[in-house]
Curated annotation (Swiss-Prot):
PTM text: Palmitoylation may be required for the formation of higher order complexes and for neurite outgrowth in cultured neural stem cells.
Protein's recorded name: Flotillin-2
Name of the gene this protein is made from: flot2
Taxonomic lineage: Eukaryota, Metazoa, Chordata, Craniata, Vertebrata
GO cellular component terms listed in the entry, alphabetical order: endocytic vesicle; endosome; flotillin complex
Induction remarks: By optic nerve injury.
GO BP annotation list: cell adhesion; protein localization to plasma membrane; regulation of myoblast differentiation
Name of a matching Pfam family: Flot
The species this protein was found in: Carassius auratus
Function: May play a role in axon growth and regeneration. May be involved in epidermal cell adhesion and epidermal structure and function.
An MF annotation (GO) of this entry: protease binding
Length: 428
């Protein structure tokens, strides 16, 4: 006989042994199995996660710095049939602590070997990469035990020589410096980004304003086009209305003109008849008497003209007769004067200087009259002289200068005439 055994999902049931010396093994996870009494063996192995805390103390790194590293690993037995059989071969019958001890030693060994290939900075600054290397190196070894590494992380890294502390201070200073630089660069980038954002905002605003202005302009253009079209239609309508009104006014005016023409024709006919009547009346009242009066005046004018012609002819004859008489008289006087001049010339030739003297003396009154003509218009002559005998001296001087003036005017030298020589000598 036998019994039925069950197992939960966190354990694996291994049934081994059978009749007739069979070595078949049955691995059951989360199920049941039949086991024969006395000839079958049943064992259990846990499938739960096992937490390990590997620790490597004073392990020298690639630079020879001794550090201590602690980690946390999560491992479990794999449920694959073949790998589960391997795990059962390795750990079946062992407690969880024994299994954890085996795996822990394996992980610590790999952790120690990897620490020797890295620097402190690589281990300290990039723990994830360090953990990944440990996991990759240790996974094949623990896998051959049927164990799977679910996770492995570095918990702590420290040393006894304050190397990491000094490195941390340096790193802190560098980080602080980088932080300050980062802050400055961030502020710079923020300022640049803010300026770019403002520029983009202004560009967007300007673009929006431009589009708004374009839209407004398009709207205004469309309004203007619509208004122009409306105004054009209104103008065309108004023009058509005015044209029709003008045509109607023209028709009315033509009819009025026709009426005026008819009225004017009637008026002209009446005026023509009135003119004919007036002409007949004028002929009867004015023309006939005027013609009679004109004939009368014409006859009177012809009589006056004939009278004036006869009078003019008589006057002309009178003037002609008078002219002929005056011509005869002038001719006789001229002949007498010519004869007188001839006789005078003969006498002047006969008497010589005496005749010339007579002529000069005869001309002296006329010369004196011409010379004194300007003085005739003078009311009074005042001679200023302190001596009364001065007047007679002035008169004598004028008389002494007289022959010179006569000689200049007539060419006759009176100073050579005996009579004047005697007169001037007596005066002297």
């Amino acid at each position: 006989m036998g019994c039925c055994l069950t197992v939960g999902p966190n354990e694996a049931l291994v049934v081994s042994g059978a009749c007739c010396g069979s070595d078949a093994k049955t691995y059951v996870v989360g199920g049941w199995a039949w086991a024969w009494w006395l000839i079958s063996d049943t064992q259990r192995i846990t499938l739960e996660i096992m937490t390990l805390q590997p620790k490597c103390e004073d392990v020298e790194t690639a630079e020879g710095v001794a550090i201590t590293v602690t980690g946390v690993a999560q491992v479990k037995v794999m449920t694959d049939q073949d790998l589960l059989a391997v795990a059962c071969e390795q750990f079946l019958g062992k407690s969880v602590m024994e299994i954890k001890a085996v795996v822990l030693q394996t992980l610590e060994g790999h952790l120690r070997s990897i620490l020797g290939t890295l620097t402190v900075e690589q281990i300290y600054q990039d723990r994830d990469e360090f953990a990944r290397l440990v996991r990759e190196v240790a996974a094949p070894d623990v896998g051959r035990m049927g164990i799977e590494i679910l996770s492995f992380t570095i918990k702590d890294v420290y040393d006894k020589l304050d190397y990491l502390s000094s490195l941390g201070k340096t790193q802190t200073a560098a980080v602080q410096r980088d932080a300050d630089i980062g802050v400055a660069e961030a502020e710079r980038d923020a300022g640049i980004r803010e300026a770019e954002c403002k520029k983009e905002m202004m560009d967007v605003k300007f673009l929006a304003d431009t589009r708004m202005a374009d839209s407004k302009r398009e709207l205004e253009l469309q309004k203007a086009a619509f208004n122009q079209e409306v105004n054009t239609k209104k103008a065309e309508s108004q023009l058509a209305y005015e044209l029709e009104a003008a045509k109607e006014q023209q028709k009315i005016r033509l009819e009025e003109i026709e009426i005026e023409v008819v009225q004017r024709k009637k008026q002209i006919s009446i005026e023509e008849k009135e003119i004919e009547r007036t002409e007949k009346e004028l002929i009867a009242t004015v023309k006939r008497p005027a013609e009679a009066e004109a004939y009368k005046m014409q006859q009177l004018a012809e009589g006056q003209k004939l009278k004036k012609v006869l009078i003019a002819q008589a006057e002309s004859e009178k003037i002609r007769k008078i002219g002929e008489a005056e011509a005869i008289s002038i001719s006789s006087v001229g002949k007498a004067e010519a004869e007188s001049m001839r006789l005078k010339a003969e006498a002047y030739q006969q008497y010589g200087e005496a005749a010339k003297t007579a002529l000069v003396l005869e001309a002296l009154p006329k010369i004196a009259g011409k010379v004194a003509a300007p003085l005739a218009r003078t009311n009074e002559i005042v001679i200023l002289s302190g001596d009364g005998s001065r007047v007679s001296g002035e008169v004598n001087r004028l008389l002494a200068e007289l022959p010179v003036s006569i000689n200049a005017l007539t060419g006759v030298d009176l100073s050579k005439m005996p009579l004047l020589q005697k007169m001037t000598g007596a005066q002297a």
